[in-house]
Amino acid sequence: MEDYLQGCRAALQESRPLHVVLGNEACDLDSTVSALALAFYLAKTTEAEEVFVPVLNIKRSELPLRGDIVFFLQKVHIPESILIFRDEIDLHALYQAGQLTLILVDHHILSKSDTALEEAVAEVLDHRPIEPKHCPPCHVSVELVGSCATLVTERILQGAPEILDRQTAALLHGTIILDCVNMDLKIGKATPKDSKYVEKLEALFPDLPKRNDIFDSLQKAKFDVSGLTTEQMLRKDQKTIYRQGVKVAISAIYMDLEAFLQRSNLLADLHAFCQAHSYDVLVAMTIFFNTHNEPVRQLAIFCPHVALQTTICEVLERSHSPPLKLTPASSTHPNLHAYLQGNTQVSRKKLLPLLQEALSAYFDSMKIPSGQPETADVSREQVDKELDRASNSLISGLSQDEEDPPLPPTPMNSLVDECPLDQGLPKLSAEAVFEKCSQISLSQSTTASLSKK
């Protein structure tokens, strides 16, 4: 694999047609390994004059945000320097020159910025339900399994098992295990095909790491934020909502809030992050397990606009549907309110509707019609000043006894919050894995308590 990837970088220097195997924009471990392994297979089994190049669909600078990928590449001795990232190859220029053929792996819909490349797509290999209206008119291979790496493994072992080396096998093996949550039947992510090909890889390469060991190490690396800057931590697992000119970032942070608040230059970093990305509010939701292996969630609301911050805190504190059970935590930082979240079952997905409601309350208090677009003749600065002037009337307009009506949830990949059969087998985000483990932990504690009685 390593020698092949070295050759791919050399091929970029030549003016010749390329077959680009492109992973999805999330660029998680499954997408990355599937692109690398599929391109490797195609290169080894296709006529010599055709060049197959795997491309990671992110900028190189974003790789440190994906700790599991960085860790795994180091473990199997593949240098990051020989990988090809999206900002290192001009796909649109290649297409215009008639030198691009695309193979999409772990997705089947091009991003809006890449829709012009649709005619270049020759093949799709994915493991999620097809959206026919958006799928390119090409050969499409889709099967609802837990990991796309399973489908790549199947193709290699059925088509050319002799090309599979230990390095590639280790990448595929670890990826399937991480994606399928260590093949845990309680989680329900792994399918019989996932299990079948993990077993086949283990039979071919008996010295592969034990499942528990590779899962634990990859999971630890995925959640590890110790080497990240504050901005990288905030961007690692982030969602954004936007309403009437106000942008709110919601970041999942996998460490104790107290430790996060003690980071040097934190306040300056938060200000810089919000300013750089035009965020009016930053909500940090910390997630970790304590020494008793119990889930802990905490919240921090950072917002320079006093009225807006107050409204958000009011709505979250008095929420009954769902109840967050917030307890104020100490914070010496101005513009930042911190809380311990007593109800650990409220995930970020369930928090999003409450934030939407808080924005509605904010605008309603100023008599701004819901859904009214920003006026072209009023500057953003003028709007911000008017919002701040309305702070007094805002607080008096909120009823402490009024129950917050739940809004339709923002769609997210979560095996816990939605039926896994609704949209096929979903990707498990770090948030979803934490949530599922929390429920299992809570269930086990309840069962143990009842048995004692």
UniProtKB/Swiss-Prot annotation:
Keywords from the UniProt entry: Acetylation, Cell junction, Cytoplasm, Disease variant, Hydrolase, Intellectual disability, Manganese, Metal-binding, Neurodegeneration, Nucleus, Phosphoprotein, Primary microcephaly
Entry's cofactor comment: Binds 2 manganese ions per subunit.
Positions of modified residues (Phosphothreonine): 410
Primary site of residence: cytoplasm
Enzyme class of the recorded protein, top EC level: hydrolase
Any one biological process term the GO annotation gives: regulation of microtubule polymerization
Cofactor: Mn(2+)
Binding site for Mn(2+) 2: 30, 106, 179
Pfam name, any one: DHH
GO cellular component: cytoplasm; cytosol; focal adhesion; nucleus
Subcellular location per the Swiss-Prot or TrEMBL entry: Cytoplasm; Nucleus; Cell junction, Focal adhesion
Effect of residue 28 to A: Partial loss of cAMP PDE activity. Partial loss of cAMP PDE activity. Partial loss of cAMP PDE activity
UniProt xrefs under SMART domains: DHHA2
GO molecular function, one term: exopolyphosphatase activity
SUPFAM superfamilies: DHH phosphoesterases
Function: Phosphodiesterase (PDE) that has higher activity toward cAMP than cGMP, as substrate. Plays a role in cell proliferation, migration and differentiation, and acts as a negative regulator of NME1. Plays a role in the regulation of neurogenesis. Involved in the regulation of microtubule polymerization.
Complex formation: Homooligomer. Able to homodimerize via its C-terminal domain. Interacts with NME1. Interacts with GSK3; at focal adhesion complexes where paxillin and vinculin are colocalized. Interacts with alpha and beta tubulin.
Record disease entry: Neurodevelopmental disorder with microcephaly, hypotonia, and variable brain anomalies: An autosomal recessive neurodevelopmental and degenerative disorder characterized by primary microcephaly, profound global developmental delay, and severe intellectual disability. Additional clinical features include dysmorphic features, truncal hypotonia, peripheral spasticity, and lack of independent ambulation or speech acquisition. Brain imaging shows cortical atrophy, thin corpus callosum, cerebellar hypoplasia, and delayed myelination.
Protein name as it appears in the record: Exopolyphosphatase PRUNE1
Species per Swiss-Prot/TrEMBL record: Homo sapiens
Gene designation: PRUNE1
